[in-house]
Amino acid sequence: MPDVSSIFEKREYIRQFAINNNYDGFFQIDDDVEYVAFSIENSTPRKTSGAYITYKCDFNMMLNRVIEKSIEHDAALASVTQYENVCWRKPHEVSVNSKLNFAQFVYITTDKIKDISYDTSGEINEDLDILIRLLQHGRKAICVCDYGFKINNKAIHNIATSTLYDNSLDKYYKFILNTSAKYHPTLWVKNGRLRTRYHYKKYFNTTELPPIDDKILDMCKNGQANELIDYLIKQKEK
């Protein structure tokens, strides 16, 4: 850990880390919400129009995935694999005609980052400690805040799409479709089948959903969360 104690010092450490290493660093979207993004692939500067950002993911869930690999943070953070190579998009870039911009990331998220400037709780300090440790392990992280938006006049929060990896043996797509505070499924595609955890299980009594088709992939890529859910339920009922 760097020799810093206050939240402000830790925040500045992260900011300077981004600047010194030619990462995107902090940038402002809303007046009171600040985001930070670090690109693993920093050999070519990324265009600002291709911001890879997601909004308000469950920080504790992400953190638990990391910590469960080891009791010691350092060992755990060094072995993060679940959330590698992730790509996110801005809300206004989500449309039926938009194409995904893929890049490689490891990310850790929190909806508390916007409170760092004036919140002195130990929880915030711990979050920043973890973020700094990620950076010191050579991981580049994305910290994001709460944000919601609409598609087709339906409130859809935290839609994100990503490619985790694509090699000769397997294609693995993961995307989060959070349609409400009560409904937070995680879906992914592996070996040609759409798989899921959390709330989808109560609808389908299984974590393995119907084989994916072009329509499913299109809805995933276009962020059509509600349409996808309806389609999957109908497919399951056949």
State what each model feature region is.
Residues M1-I29, E34-T48:
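Active-site-proximal specificity loops/subdomain of glycosyltransferases
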Residues E12-Q16, V94-S95, F204:
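Short, surface-exposed amphipathic charged segments that create phosphate/polyanion-binding patches used
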Residues N20-N21, E72-H73, H137, K182:
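Alpha-helix C-cap/termination motif
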Residues G25-I29, A76-T81, A141-C145, W188-K190:
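A structural signal for short, well-ordered beta-strand segments and their strand-loop junctions
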Residues D32, E84, G148-F149:
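Conserved beta-strand edge residues that scaffold enzyme active sites
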Residues Y35-D129, Q136:
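Conserved catalytic core of nucleotide-sugar-dependent glycosyltransferases
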Residues G122-K238:
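C-terminal catalytic/acceptor-binding lobe
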